[in-house]
């Protein structure tokens, strides 16, 4: 064979081999490696389905479609498919959701701080859940500033914390936390805690000693080692097989990584589509078997896939008509399905993978239209609460924005005229669910969320002079220069109708809205 013919033969055979490789390589599912389960593909097509909850706030055991949750938050999935959910609000229970969707109660049932079995135990706003290899559950008991343990038989004990807010390392039952929302357990049985309102990550070792892994004396946004690092209201936490701790750093809109030596770095995020808005208030985390992440958002309700290199893709909650409210808890089962709680819609969902080219079908999402409104008894948010007040804005009006666009959005609530400095009062009893319930400090749209009600255009928790209305419920944070920067109200804080929430700012009216974004209703 001539040299030219031989070269052409090599070229042709190489081309055929490359073409064959391209044609037979599937995009999804990924082939199973010989050493274990398949690698988690990026950007898989998702199908959302309802597991349990009828979308009405309440407490009701029974078949999934008729069961009711109040404020479903943390979730774990066992090998047999059973799910456990931490249900806060007025429920304060740990619920069991069987494979067939039937819901029952494992432990709790009243707001308090008591160890015991089943209904004898008491929780105060249970948030995240984690599990150990023996099948025990660990609860971030936010309102009790404690970490609790629940056995498969429903026996509840306190692992760490005194029941009082504070910050102290040391023996577990003498250590103090401040509203912990996140909890995770590694393969050695060590417990990691997102100590939310201390802005720290804590570690409960197997010898019962509590130490601080990372974070300092004040909130902030700095990478570094140990106490040099700063967090801003960390809520979600997970630990992978290599000992790396992942943190949903809520107020910093960031995912943070803590290495085995305690060095904190921020994961650089980049979307698969340049038009997608970046993560907004990451709330919850779950890890895949190969160390990638799923992240739930507080404000948009989206569930996102986040790879270790920072690439991310919206899986659920981003499509028209399929909007979610608050992806508060996430868990991944052995088959790779993602289970999550939608706290604002009082439901539990599952996300499954579809083959490439298969379109997802619409699922039941959002709160039910039958979800009852808060009991306001006709109260107004200003004095006199049973008197006459002028309504200056109603639900559904066409409104402009601050940049001059006259038809920017539909008004999402009710506006009541009030004098600048007038005290804003709660119109119903309520309990704070959001870990970041106050927003836009000193801005025109400053507001506070109490249960399903939002109170806007006020100085949250402050008089016109800036003094706190109630230091036990409102905490004033300062920036590095010592200037006031934010009001913090813990998840689990209660307000009664008539309690002072703030004072009207220079907008000269109070705004009331009810319901998660996309599901607004008339607040009066």
Which stretches of residues belong to each language-model region?
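A short loop-to-beta-strand structural motif that recurs across blades of beta-propeller domains
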Residues: 92-96, 102, 145-149, 155, ...
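Short loop/turn segments immediately following the C-termini of beta-strands
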Residues: 88-89, 142-143, 196-197, 250, ...
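Residue-level detector of Asp-centered blade-edge/turn motifs that repeat once per structural unit
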Residues: 77-80, 131-134, 185-188, 239-242, ...
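Blade-level signature of beta-propeller repeat domains, shared across WD40, Kelch, NHL, RCC1
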Residues: 326-363
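N-terminal Sec-pathway targeting helices
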Residues: 1-14
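Surface-exposed, glycine-biased beta-strand/turn segments
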Residues: 358-454, 459-466, 488-510, 520-524
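Conserved beta-propeller blade signature
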Residues: 82-85, 136-138, 190-192, 244-246, ...
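Gly/Pro-rich loop segments of beta-rich domains
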Residues: 36-73, 102-127, 155-179, 209-233, ...
């Amino acid at each position: 064979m001539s040299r030219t013919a031989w070269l052409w033969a090599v070229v042709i055979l190489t081309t055929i081999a490359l073409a064959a490789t391209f044609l037979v390589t599937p995009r999804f599912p990924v082939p199973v490696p010989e050493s274990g389960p398949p690698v988690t593909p990026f950007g898989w097509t998702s199908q959302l389905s309802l597991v349990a909850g009828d979308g009405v706030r309440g407490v009701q055991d029974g078949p999934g479609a008729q069961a009711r949750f109040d404020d479903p938050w943390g979730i774990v999935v066992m090998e047999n498919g059973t799910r456990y959910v931490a249900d806060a609000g007025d429920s304060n229970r740990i619920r069991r959701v069987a494979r067939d969707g039937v819901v029952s109660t494992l432990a709790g049932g009243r707001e308090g701080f008591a160890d015991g079995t089943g209904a004898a135990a008491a929780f105060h706003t249970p948030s995240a859940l984690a599990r150990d290899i023996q099948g025990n559950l660990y609860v971030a008991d936010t309102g009790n500033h404690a970490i609790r343990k629940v056995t498969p038989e429903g026996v509840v004990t306190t692992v760490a914390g005194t029941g009082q807010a504070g910050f102290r390392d040391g023996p577990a039952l003498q250590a103090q936390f401040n509203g912990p929302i996140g909890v995770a357990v590694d393969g050695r049985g060590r417990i990691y805690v997102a100590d939310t309102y201390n802005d720290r990550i804590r570690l409960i070792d197997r010898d019962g000693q509590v130490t601080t892994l990372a974070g300092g004396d004040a909130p902030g946004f700095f990478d570094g080692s140990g106490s040099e690092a700063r967090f801003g209201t960390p809520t979600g936490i997970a630990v992978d097989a290599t000992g790396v701790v992942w943190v949903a750093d809520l107020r910093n809109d960031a995912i943070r990584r803590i290495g085995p030596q305690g060095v904190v770095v921020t994961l650089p995020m980049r979307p698969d589509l340049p038009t997608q808005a970046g993560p907004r208030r990451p709330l919850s985390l779950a890890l895949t078997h190969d160390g990638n992440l799923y992240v739930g958002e507080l404000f948009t309700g989206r569930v996102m896939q986040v790879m270790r290199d920072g690439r991310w893709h919206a899986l659920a909650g981003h499509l028209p008509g399929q909007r979610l409210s608050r992806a508060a808890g996430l868990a991944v089962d052995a088959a790779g399905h993602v289970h999550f709680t939608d706290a604002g819609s009082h439901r539990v969902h599952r996300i499954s993978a579809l083959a490439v080219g298969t379109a997802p079908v619409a699922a039941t999402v959002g709160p039910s239209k039958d979800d009852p409104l808060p009991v306001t008894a006709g109260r107004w948010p200003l004095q006199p609460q049973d008197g006459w007040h002028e309504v200056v804005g109603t639900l559904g009006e066409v409104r402009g924005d601050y940049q001059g666009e006259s038809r920017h959005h539909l008004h999402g609530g009710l506006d009541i005229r009030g004098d600048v400095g007038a005290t804003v009062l709660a119109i119903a009893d309520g309990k704070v669910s959001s870990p970041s319930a106050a927003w836009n400090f000193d801005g025109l749209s400053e507001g506070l969320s109490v249960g399903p009600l939002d109170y806007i255009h006020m100085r949250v928790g402050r008089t016109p002079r800036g003094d706190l209305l109630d230091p036990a419920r409102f905490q004033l944070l300062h920036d590095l220069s010592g200037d006031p920067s934010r009001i913090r109200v813990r998840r689990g804080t209660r307000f009664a109708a008539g309690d002072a929430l703030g004072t009207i700012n220079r907008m000269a009216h109070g705004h009331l809205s009810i319901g998660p974004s996309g599901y607004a209703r008339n607040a009066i």
